[in-house]
From Swiss-Prot:
It comes from the Bacteria. Gene3D superfamilies: DHBP synthase (3.90.870.10). InterPro entries: DHBP_synth_RibB-like_a/b_dom (IPR017945), Sua5-like_dom (IPR006070), TC-AMP_synthase (IPR023535), TC-AMP_synthase_SUA5 (IPR050156). Keywords: ATP-binding, Cytoplasm, Nucleotide-binding, Nucleotidyltransferase, Transferase, tRNA processing. GO terms for molecular function: ATP binding; double-stranded RNA binding; L-threonylcarbamoyladenylate synthase; tRNA binding. It is an enzyme of class 2 (transferase). Its EC number is 2.7.7.87. Belongs to the SUA5 family. TsaC subfamily. This is Threonylcarbamoyl-AMP synthase. It comes from Mannheimia succiniciproducens (strain KCTC 0769BP / MBEL55E). Its main location: cytoplasm. It is found in: Cytoplasm.
Length: 183
């Protein structure tokens, strides 16, 4: 599908697939409970796990982050460019719903450099949820055709290539820098 069609689907609180730095992600409007519920059902993902949020600029992630708990050094980590995509687990605002944070009082966020994410966020005006586009037990999709093979020929997928990263993002804690998932 073309960018404009994917943007319309996102604005209608539908789940779409889009390319990220290494693999295709499944995403939706994180402010829509119904959209997130559709995503969780599609992925067969327990709500307790929480979701990653991606955007091309920090402004779109700030509504989810408890800024009062972060120091300048944390902001530097969050906004720095890395060799591999890096998702940071940061304190969530109390207003962030549990369908985003899961069982945690934190939220996982990533500034994504992929042009597709930038265009989608710019045109929708919101960050996107991001979980790898794959059915349980199958590897994450690296092409639009793989997405269609797993989710059906008519699943809304943005026809663009993934970035050059080899692995999905590394996930780290902003305070301890503990690695939850290697990139």
């Amino acid at each position: 599908m073309e960018l404009a069609q994917i943007v319309e689907r996102l604005k209608k609180n539908e789940v779409v697939a889009y390319p990220t730095e290494a693999v295709f992600g499944l995403g939706c409007n994180p402010n829509s409970k119904s959209a997130v519920e559709k995503l969780l059902i599609l992925k067969q993902r327990p709500v307790e796990k929480g979701l990653i949020l991606v955007a091309h600029k920090l402004d779109l992630l700030l509504p989810f982050i408890d800024e009062s708990r972060l120091k300048q050094s944390h902001w530097q980590l969050l906004t720095q460019q890395y060799d591999c995509p890096t998702t940071w687990v940061v304190p969530a605002k109390l207003s962030v719903p549990k369908f985003i944070t899961g069982q945690f009082d934190s939220v996982a966020v990533r500034l994504c450099t992929h042009p597709a994410v930038a265009q989608l966020c710019e045109q929708t005006g919101f960050a996107l949820t991001s979980t790898s586009a794959n059915l349980s037990g199958l590897p994450p999709c690296k092409t639009a055709q793989q997405v269609r093979s797993q989710f059906g020929e008519f699943f809304p997928v943005l026809d663009m290539a993934v970035g050059n990263a080899v692995n999905p993002s590394e996930i780290r804690d902003i305070f301890s820098r503990q690695i939850f998932r290697r990139g």
